[in-house]
Curated annotation (Swiss-Prot):
Gene Ontology BP term (one): positive regulation of translation
Residue ranges constituting the RRM domain according to the UniProt record: 240-307
Gene name in the database record: LARP4B
Gene source species: Homo sapiens
Modified-residue entries (Phosphoserine), positions: S244, S424, S434, S451, S488, S498, S524, S556, S568, S601, S664, S718, S727, S736
A cellular component term, taken from the record's GO annotations: cytosol
Protein name as it appears in the record: La-related protein 4B
Modified-residue entries (N6-acetyllysine), positions: K724
Upper classification of the organism: Eukaryota, Metazoa, Chordata, Craniata, Vertebrata
Role this protein plays: Stimulates mRNA translation.
Keyword check for Glycosyltransferase: no
Amino acid sequence: MTSDQDAKVVAEPQTQRVQEGKDSAHLMNGPISQTTSQTSSIPPLSQVPATKVSELNPNAEVWGAPVLHLEASSAADGVSAAWEEVAGHHADRGPQGSDANGDGDQGHENAALPDPQESDPADMNALALGPSEYDSLPENSETGGNESQPDSQEDPREVLKKTLEFCLSRENLASDMYLISQMDSDQYVPITTVANLDHIKKLSTDVDLIVEVLRSLPLVQVDEKGEKVRPNQNRCIVILREISESTPVEEVEALFKGDNLPKFINCEFAYNDNWFITFETEADAQQAYKYLREEVKTFQGKPIKARIKAKAIAINTFLPKNGFRPLDVSLYAQQRYATSFYFPPMYSPQQQFPLYSLITPQTWSATHSYLDPPLVTPFPNTGFINGFTSPAFKPAASPLTSLRQYPPRSRNPSKSHLRHAIPSAERGPGLLESPSIFNFTADRLINGVRSPQTRQAGQTRTRIQNPSAYAKREAGPGRVEPGSLESSPGLGRGRKNSFGYRKKREEKFTSSQTQSPTPPKPPSPSFELGLSSFPPLPGAAGNLKTEDLFENRLSSLIIGPSKERTLSADASVNTLPVVVSREPSVPASCAVSATYERSPSPAHLPDDPKVAEKQRETHSVDRLPSALTATACKSVQVNGAATELRKPSYAEICQRTSKEPPSSPLQPQKEQKPNTVGCGKEEKKLAEPAERYREPPALKSTPGAPRDQRRPAGGRPSPSAMGKRLSREQSTPPKSPQ
């Protein structure tokens, strides 16, 4: 039992040493390099009671760079010596611990007892020194903290005093726009505003302490309630008023050279007969001011008018509360109409950020803004871009003016396409001369044959006009070339509806498109022809029947039996002079005079190509807008509907007007049968009012004329095609000439 107790006694001092070394090492916050190497060499201690030694191993590995102190090294020596003892004891005990008898314990006891006794004096001294020294360090640090705490209590007050003095100094107020903006008319700043400054809050948040410090500052003035503070007015300048500039400086200075007066710094003339005398301090200025008012009183026979002026802060103290400075007035002297506001940029054609011109409001500028197509095409909401292309929205300067080649995506591209093309015919002469603008195959190819050419070979095609011609319809992308119509990246939306919409447009503008190229405008001398130029031809009725059977089969299908045409032949001959008498009043009927002029005799046949050429030239020069021509032809129908005797004559005039000029290259073939053409058309037209309705003769004459002249004699057109044209014309109401 005694041996076991002795072994426990030996193990306990070793454990205490290790534990004290561990604590001392923690107190110094410094790792011991030797500890790591030696603790790694310790074998596992499963049978030793002092197993707490292994707890140092993970802590030793975490420690960083070695920082050695004298106390740490001495403690480390003691701890390492204790560890060496323990390691030696375990190494000696290792083979003996396996014995079954108690000799091993006795040997270990004999070997272990002397070592602690021998190592105790040196090791325990080192271990005793370590903790005692380490314990003194926190005491010193605590005393140091206690000693510095009163300093910190005094320092914040002094630092706060200096900081507040600087914040409210004239040097800082000259540049601190925030404090200036918080000043009232008396230059008072709320103390709470000063206390909320960052560098003041770091020092103290006690408002009472800040007010106390501010009251102790000589350069600032706190109001009676302790709520506001302002810098002291440095009243050190005495102002003398109503002293002329011509007064010598010496005389003014002599006023302040008394024995009881302080010395002034400067004496100078200011403005408006005011003199400034500057003193060093406010007390000196007050003393001089009192001297002048009480003792001198007069100067140059006048009472002295003296004031004390505060030294101005180098700022404008009447700024608005928001802290913004007013602009320099000198800017307006150089730039009279310059504005101080900032507008969002409106991108002109020279700038490359165009999309914002749609988003920003309209600025009615002279130069149109434009859209860059590469920037418009990826725009996700293309309906927003087309939001400005409503037919009812017509801005004065549209941002989509130059988008003629690059229109954005539209649900019905042909809608905007035709909106520009068709109405511009009313403004631009000859726009409809080229049928290729409208890709209408039914109009361009009549029965497989191209419609007669309506312009000179050298005449330029007036398709793309000046953008100013589209000023009324700037809301849409505009007409596009056929090539760019297909290659344009943005024209993909709703192509399926384009053909159906085009057919509707075809119905609306068929008459204007087909009639406008055909009616010629002969020269003005043709208006002066009398009735004698068109005598009735007696033998025309017999020859007419065979010609109409071959050339006017379309008319015979609609009109009916040829008997009625034969019966009305004489009546048409009789009404012809009446028709001609009204000719000069109708612009569209002017061509009939030229046609009748060469009808009576074959002697005029050699001149027919020249006359036709002349008519074509005047047709290209004197062409009116298509709407005017259409109304002229429709006025013929309206007037014809009024009186039944005149109606065939006006319809015949309109038919002859539409037939003769386009077929001028083919006219010599037709003129081989003289004296038959003029009356034949009359006979055919006279029977129409009784058989058919009154309006379609103008349309029937217009598209049917080239078809009858260009078709071979035996051909017969399909009745459904012609009936379709007539049904379309019914939907177009007649217009008055005015």
